[in-house]
Amino acid sequence: LDKYPDDAIQAGQAIKTVDDANQAIIGIYAAFKDASLYSGRLTLLPDLQTDLVYAVTGYSNQYGDLWRWNILATNEDIEAVYGALYAIINRCNFLLDYIPGVQQSTTDDDALDKLEMIHGEALFARALCYSELIKLFCNSYESDGEAENELGVVLTSHYDSVDNTRRASLKDSYQFVLDDLELAAEYLKIDENSVSKDDLYSTTYINEYTVYALRARIALYMKHYTEAIKYSTKVIDSGYY
């Protein structure tokens, strides 16, 4: 008999309702707390490469190669960061692929509003992961012309992608992030009349101004300083932070 495991869900049945989509986005939020990401290596390893850390006599040489800037291609800590970021991208792609189907089968306006917010959160999460990958594994962005000939990252926009896994250009990689952020900002647009200053300041969820903050950071990476000022000013002038 061809039986499916009792403790698993077939991919095609995983996201059928808005509640399913909400559970998926909660899982994406939780994935950022992975020991290889913001609860560990992604924040720890860069610190080890700065003057914030000094190796004393008798230390165990843990992370010693990173501290000495003698990093081999076989470094497992670097591999873990890379893999964890792409794992979240994969989860975002899975959710984003199924959102249109959920939207078609949903008639309640409040549920559709919730789904739109989830859509924006997933787009932001994917953009954030790609921005980290670009920052860590690509050369710096010097100009639009040079970026066309620099290697970027492997871009995937669908869970079951059959595209060749070749690296896009640095320019195209950044454009992918910008496109995701632009769409995310539309889905996460805040109704100024329905949210309080304190609620938005203390929220732990992605919102319109989270998108603008990352957009400003990306502009800095790209040396588009006017854009960086534009989007950072949106956050500052909002009065929420």
List PLM regions with ranges:
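Membrane-proximal, proline-rich intrinsically disordered regions
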Residues: 1-47
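Residue-level signature for tetratricopeptide repeat
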Residues: 129, 216-218
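Residue signature of alpha-solenoid helical repeat architecture, marking inter-repeat boundaries
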Residues: 117, 150, 172, 199-202, ...
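Conserved, well-structured interaction surfaces
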Residues: 61-137, 168, 186-188
